[in-house]
From Swiss-Prot:
Protein name: Proline--tRNA ligase
Xref: Gene3D superfamilies: Anticodon-binding domain, Bira Bifunctional Protein, Domain 2, C-terminal domain of ProRS
Description of its domains: Consists of three domains: the N-terminal catalytic domain, the anticodon-binding domain and the C-terminal extension.
Broad enzyme group: ligase
A single Gene Ontology CC term: aminoacyl-tRNA synthetase multienzyme complex
Organism, as annotated: Mesomycoplasma hyopneumoniae (strain J / ATCC 25934 / NCTC 10110)
Highest classification ranks of the organism: Bacteria, Bacillati, Mycoplasmatota, Mycoplasmoidales, Metamycoplasmataceae
Amino acid sequence: MKKPEKITSRTANFAKWYVDVITQADLMNYGPIKGTIYFKPLGYKIWENIVKIVNAYFVKQKIENVYFPLLIPQDFIEKEKKHIEGFAPELLTITKVGGKNLVENIYIRPTSELLFADYFKAEIAKNNILPIKLNQWSQVLRWEKTTNPFLRNTEFLWQEGHTIHASKVEADQFAKKIARFYKYFLENYLAIPVISGQKTEREKFAGAVNTYTVEAMMQNFRALQSATAHFLGQNFAKNFEIFYKNKENKSQIPFQTSWGLSTRLIGAIVMVHSDDNGLIFPPKIAPIQVDILEFFSKKNQEVKIFAKKIAKILKNAKISYKIDDTDQQIGYKINNSEVHGAPIRIEIGPNEVKNNQICLVRRDNHQKFFFNIDLLKEKCRKILEQIQADLFKKAKIRLLENTVFVNSINEFEQAIKNNKFVIAPFSESPEREQEIQEKTGATARCILPKNSFFALPQTGNSIFSGEKTNKFVLFAKSY
């Protein structure tokens, strides 16, 4: 078995550190085409855990799963030119099949609003029942100019939900409800604190009336848009001529939403929590919660028996585990466990067997605990809960300590230069946002709501024009 290579430190080269971690921890291999990856079993298990948790919420909300075509016809594209303009540079087009040119181009979905609009039109014409709430777990393809494993892939996995409603208010409220769930999911399961808000006109989803986002801070202080929900209004319904009959039997145009999260959350978990030794998983999303390491088990069968006893206790407690019963050296086993990020490791040697004792080590802070095996279930559960809480607390402190409020463009530029998240009073045009991006590299992440956990003043003077505004916008460099 190959010895784990040394991981580049975060301070030396954060981008190289990230790639070192995800490759050495066996999350992925690079695919044969730019921007594609092979999901290895550990990497895919993270996604399976995400799917399980998120899907359970969808079931409670009476959102049903479907699967729609990968291919989009040309006439759909022509109906929604404004929507497609946002994806034009990334849109993959099929022009030829088997050496024969197609009469009309076929497009590979970058997202599925067009397909859902077509589906909704047929279903409403048939049944006239609203709302319809659907979701699909699928892959999409976008020919990204700059790629980064998990964070920005040419092909990636995601869920995209789509609903259609009779009422504008109901549709917009549903989009906000999903955005609140995304915030809850990231904070309570992934231990990633987020800043939520509404996208600016320049940054909102093409074809949306409003886009609601959750933004996370990585360890290098860059923002990651982690999930979004869109109120689409009647934009797609009008272009696809979708109508329903109201109580007065009059034809009305309904309102739509779309919302999604993707495998970029795997990258977020790595970038928020991991260290120079490798992965650190929050227990609630960890593929393996406990690594059981056998020492000298080849010469001492009692170590193996003790490991199986521990495994049985963990299994009954519904705590996931893996036993390392290889004949590798102790240092290798410990290092390998560190790289792969299980929240807890249990080290078993002849001494532990002799004393009927557990040696438990936390992955996040390397704190050691010694206790009788009879306490394993209770102790393990408690420590896993504490790790989950501590990881969130650490990330929340990082977010708060590195988010600053500014009142002038000079303060703004200096704060961005210092790699801060910046909150500024801002009521300027999209052209001003573009100017900021060109000058500083920062983009508007979201307009903060009045109930934000940041103590915002009622009004401020916009940093460019000086005009009084009640709008405060979060800016940051981002992925």
